């Protein structure tokens, strides 16, 4: 049976690991170290570690794989194939070249578009109507390897980064399992990425999280769903942070300055730069838990007036 080393960290990677382990001999799992999580900073293992332990697979958690003693140990396992999915570190050539069939990666975009660590976020932020998963060879340069297989999936108006992560995670596992038999048999010819079509999905900055109400409504709507459920788009209300977790978009022109509030007793609408409307459905005022808009409007939201503007 083909011996595989798997490397991954977040929940996105778990279905890939589980599918691999159901059909192949996964001899080791490499993931990031346990990290403090939440307000109480409780040391928490990555989702992949939990899954690997449940499957009875040995787990390695080097802080920096490139300089760790575990690197040589992994090479000495003489795996037939290395598979990665959102591991989180650049891998050295000594490891990439050690398996018989090399190293391949499950990447959540239609390469060469969106190389980098936040491809799902950017597909939503840019208003794409489809994205997908690419299986490609691993090289030292970030997400630059030749492509082995690719599969597309639509993005709907109701999707956000969270829903697309779930869909792409399952799609990636399915595509990998469909690809591996022919790949291991040497029946697939990989295709180089077109350098003219390369784009990057760098990690989201704090500046990208803040809503600019002078922008078109469609752009703001894509920002909200592209940053949900993490890190979450925010604006300010009376100079305090105000997160918008979920919203809908109304493509109707309305008069009013950007950030102007239109409200009745149960709904809240905010004017965007082109006069269209953002209609928040799940929000989080400063110092409060996340709540649906009806709860907000029956409480603190009752005090909002038409002279109040978001972003001020």
UniProtKB/Swiss-Prot annotation:
Q: Which reaction does it catalyse?
A: L-methionyl-tRNA(fMet) + (6R)-10-formyltetrahydrofolate = N-formyl-L-methionyl-tRNA(fMet) + (6S)-5,6,7,8-tetrahydrofolate + H(+)
- PROSITE patterns in the cross-refs: GART (PS00373)
Give an example GO cellular component term for this record. Answer: cytosol
- What GO terms are given for molecular function? methionyl-tRNA formyltransferase activity
The protein's UniProt keywords, in alphabetical order, are: Protein biosynthesis, Transferase
User: What EC number(s) does this enzyme carry?
Assistant: 2.1.2.9
**Record: residues binding (6S)-5,6,7,8-tetrahydrofolate:** 109-112
NCBIfam families registered for this protein in UniProt: fmt (TIGR00460)
Q: Which HAMAP family match?
A: Formyl_trans
User: What role does this protein play?
Assistant: Attaches a formyl group to the free amino group of methionyl-tRNA(fMet). The formyl group appears to play a dual role in the initiator identity of N-formylmethionyl-tRNA by promoting its recognition by IF2 and preventing the misappropriation of this tRNA by the elongation apparatus.
Q: What is this protein called?
A: Methionyl-tRNA formyltransferase
Q: Which organism is it from?
A: Listeria innocua serovar 6a (strain ATCC BAA-680 / CLIP 11262)
């Amino acid at each position: 049976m083909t011996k595989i080393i798997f490397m991954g960290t977040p929940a996105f990677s778990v279905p890939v690991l589980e599918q691999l382990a159901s059909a192949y001999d996964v001899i080791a799992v490499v993931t990031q170290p346990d990290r403090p999580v939440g307000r109480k900073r409780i040391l928490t293992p990555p989702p992949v570690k939990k899954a690997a332990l449940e499957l009875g697979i040995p787990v390695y958690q080097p802080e920096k794989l490139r300089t760790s003693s575990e690197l040589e140990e992994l090479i000495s396992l003489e795996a037939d194939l290395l598979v990665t999915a959102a591991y989180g570190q650049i891998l050295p050539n000594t490891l990439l070249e050690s398996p018989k069939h090399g190293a391949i990666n499950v990447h959540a975009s239609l390469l060469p578009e969106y190389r980098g660590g936040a491809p799902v976020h950017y597909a939503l932020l840019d208003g794409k109507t489809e994205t997908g998963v690419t299986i490609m060879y691993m090289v030292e340069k970030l997400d630059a390897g030749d492509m082995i297989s690719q599969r597309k999936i639509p993005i709907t108006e109701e999707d956000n980064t969270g829903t697309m992560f779930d869909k792409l995670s399952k799609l990636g596992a399915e595509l990998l399992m469909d690809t591996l038999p022919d790949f291991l048999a040497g029946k697939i010819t990989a295709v180089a990425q077109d350098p003219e079509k390369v784009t990057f999905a760098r990690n989201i900055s704090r500046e990208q999280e803040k809503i600019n109400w002078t922008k078109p409504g469609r752009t703001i709507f894509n920002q909200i769903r592209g940053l949900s459920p993490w890190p979450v788009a925010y604006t300010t209300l009376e100079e305090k942070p105000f997160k918008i977790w979920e919203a809908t978009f109304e493509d109707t022109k309305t008069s009013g300055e950007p950030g102007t509030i239109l409200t009745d007793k149960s709904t809240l609408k905010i004017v965007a730069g082109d006069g269209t409307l953002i209609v928040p459905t799940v929000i989080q005022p400063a110092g409060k838990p996340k709540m649906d808009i009806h709860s907000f409007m029956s409480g603190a939201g009752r005090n909002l007036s038409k002279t109040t503007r978001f972003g001020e």
